[in-house]
């Protein structure tokens, strides 16, 4: 059966388990939640994009699908779009116990402008892997979190003078 996990989601303000524009485009991230191996918990990233500036994108008639309402004049599509150097979404990681319906915010020491580009439960349902990057992207941390206690411990840290380069 289905049931609502969060209640604070709001268009152009708070996204739960669905990445914002930066995460979709820059981290190829389209699912910001994961289930534990025993299916008893869900972990998700919360994106507070309330302070991110809006951007207006022109919308034309086009094709596939054709938007006939814009045949004569273009319309616009407004969305949260942080340009370089402006405020990004504030992110936090949460766990939700499906049986008890308790939500916990992970005690993750992520910078206020940092990124959480991935979360993934391990085969052990008591261990949630959380990957973080600072805004400059020259420090990567892999945390192992206990989704029931919300305690996070650094497992790996990688730092570089310029930026962390993804290995192909």
Language-model-detected regions and their locations in the chain:
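Predominantly five- to eight-bladed beta-propeller fold
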Residues: 5-33, 41-99, 103-107
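Surface loop/turn motifs at the tips and blade-to-blade linkers of beta-strand repeat domains
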Residues: 24, 107-112, 156-159
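Loop/turn position at the start of each blade in beta-propeller repeats
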Residues: 28, 88, 111-116, 137, ...
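Beta-propeller blade signature
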Residues: 1, 91-99, 142-151
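Beta-strand C-termini and the immediately following turn/loop, strongest in propeller blades
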Residues: 1, 31-34, 43-49, 83-87, ...
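Long hydrophobic segments that form regular secondary structure
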Residues: 97-134
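Local beta-strand/beta-hairpin segments that build beta-sheet-rich folds
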Residues: 2-5, 74, 153-157
């Amino acid at each position: 059966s289905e049931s609502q996990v969060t209640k604070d989601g709001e268009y152009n303000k708070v996204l739960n388990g669905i990445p914002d524009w930066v995460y979709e485009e820059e981290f190829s991230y389209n699912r910001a939640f994961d289930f534990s191996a025993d299916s008893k918990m869900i972990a998700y990233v919360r994106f507070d994009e309330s302070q991110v500036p809006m951007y207006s994108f022109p919308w034309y008639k086009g094709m596939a699908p054709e938007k006939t309402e814009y045949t004569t004049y273009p319309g616009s599509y407004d969305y949260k779009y942080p340009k370089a150097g402006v405020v990004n979404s504030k992110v936090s990681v949460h766990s939700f116990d499906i049986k008890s319906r308790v939500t916990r915010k992970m005690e993750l020491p992520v910078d206020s402008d940092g990124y959480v580009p991935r979360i993934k439960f391990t085969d052990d349902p008591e261990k949630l892997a959380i990957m973080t990057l600072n805004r400059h992207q020259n420090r990567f941390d892999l945390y192992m979190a206990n989704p029931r206690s919300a305690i996070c411990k650094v497992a790996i840290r990688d730092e570089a003078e310029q930026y962390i380069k993804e290995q192909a």
